Amino acid sequence: MKASRADLEATTRQWISLWCTPVDWALFDRLHADDFEDCSPAGRGATKKAFADGLAELVRVFPDLRSTVDDLVVDETTGRVAVRWSAVGTNRERFLRVGPTGKKTPITGIEIIEVRDGRIVRRWGEWDITAHR
């Protein structure tokens, strides 16, 4: 059964809400399928665990991280959602060979997620964190 537009939008908004501190790890587990594949792993593994490790690093480096959904495009036929998001957090640890700076750092990104049976099975994404430098 295909997910409704409202269900896909709600799943996506919950997913982006994970990129805030503190992370709701139970929600992370519920949202990501066990066979989740990160198609844009940025040098880490493509698994659910590797994605969780990347998120844990992000919120450790930016412990006051807050994220916002700026735009959503939903395709009910494929179960895919494109989301444009933004976040800001204070850099408290070394990240991408910079810092800690103690400065608020804006981060923006565009993600595409694929949802099957209410869980995210695949993710593609690109982030801009150039303001961090």
Provide a role label for each language-model segment.
Residues 1-133:
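C-terminal and inter-domain tail/linker signature
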